[in-house]
Regions:
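Conserved N-terminal beta-strand and adjoining loop/helix that marks the start
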Residues: 1-19, 40
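Generic C-terminal helix-cap and adjacent flexible tail
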Residues: 128-133
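Conserved S-adenosyl-L-methionine
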Residues: 67-71
Length: 133
């Protein structure tokens, strides 16, 4: 099974106390779960370019500062994914669910209260451990 390359953004607010998350549409894979916004890396596209494009499309922000937070591969029964989780610490505009999906700022310490897909859980735990005060 071919691995699908995905970029996902950990979008921090200015003082790194909150992260912007979005809810997956009910009709999509892992529908109804919360997630770090992002999407597929297109052929001939760098991870950085994909992150900029996906966040403009999904949450309406222009990324100005990003760095790799974690690389992870995960196999679901029906698909294999290769993730690059990107820390986004500077951007222009206010994020919102541009494609009609629900989006919100969440205190980092409250992230475990939200249901995320299994592949996101190790990243979620690391974010909470490193950034909750």
């Amino acid at each position: 099974m071919k691995r699908i390359h995905i970029v996902a953004a950990i979008i921090f607010n200015q003082d790194k106390s909150q992260i912007f998350i979005t809810k997956r549409p009910d009709d999509k894979h892992k529908g109804g779960f919360w997630e770090f916004p992002g999407g597929k890396v297109e052929p001939e596209e760098s991870v950085e370019q994909a992150m900029i494009r996906e966040l403009e499309e999904e949450v309406g922000i222009k990324v100005t500062e990003q760095s790799l937070f974690e690389h992870l591969e995960y196999d679901y029964p029906d698909k294999s994914l290769k993730f690059d989780f990107i820390s986004v610490t500077a951007f222009e505009h206010k994020p919102y669910g541009k494609e009609g999906q629900e989006g919100r700022w969440v205190d980092i310490k409250c992230l475990p209260e939200y249901a995320f897909p299994e592949a996101n859980v190790p990243i979620l735990e690391r974010v909470v451990q490193e950034f909750s005060s």
